[in-house]
Amino acid sequence: PKKQGRAANLSGKRTEYTPAPQQGCTLFSEVMTMETFLFLLELAGTVAFAVSGAVLGIEKHMDIFGVGLRGITTAVGGGILRDLVVGLTPPRAFQDPIYLLVALGVSVVLFFPFVRRIIGRSKRVFDALMLIMDAAGLGIFTITGMNTATTLAGCTDPLLLVFVGLLTGTGGGVLRDILAGDMPYILRKHIYASASIAGGILYLLLRHLCNRNFHMKFFF
């Protein structure tokens, strides 16, 4: 009987193994869409540039209004100039106030006395903070500015896109320095303009050369 039962089992229909579909890419694309990714990237750039503008206002002993104005101008000024150039009106900063609110909130926090003491304690710390925040904001806004001009305004001309990226990445800093009566950073020995242009050209090359698989589509 055991042999018969075993034979019956062996002669029965085999259940074919069907591997479960891989849901990694689908799940990832649902959780982190391109729109969400760019939104988070723009928020990070907004915070970085708001810190940059507010800290410079604190260094010049401005009141809370001046610190807040410099933080907001640095954070959203480049984006406003970009939108005016490509014809997106009203500018996105006024359509979605989250960027203005984030920049204002960061500026107010940095104005607190204990935060100002930490920042002003060391010139080395101040210079390092400014370098990191400016570099982060410049890189983020150069790329997101070009992407916005492409997706929302339909810009395809490479020269215009590189200019828009430069304007988005450096425009806020230029307005910040003008408000404080300083010569803009990009007109001095700093390489902000050159770095923004180089980053914009590299971004265009990567978009042109990518093989359009999932990962490349997600980022480019």
Regions flagged by a language model, labelled:
Residues 16-28:
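Short, often N-terminal, low-complexity regions
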Residues 33-36, 84-94, 144-160, 207-216:
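Helix-coil boundary and interhelical linker segments in multi-pass alpha-helical membrane proteins
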Residues 35-46, 93-105, 157-168:
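Structural signature of hydrophobic alpha-helical transmembrane segments
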Residues 51-60, 110-124, 174-184:
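C-terminal ends of transmembrane helices
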Residues 54, 69-73, 80-86, 163, ...:
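Short, structured motif recognition centered on aromatic/hydrophobic residues
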Residues 71-77, 129-144, 165, 191-204:
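Small-residue-rich segments of transmembrane alpha-helices in multi-pass membrane proteins
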Residues 95-100, 157, 188-194, 212-220:
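Loop-to-transmembrane alpha-helix initiation sites
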Residues 103-147:
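Ordered, amphipathic secondary-structure segments that act as subunit-interaction surfaces
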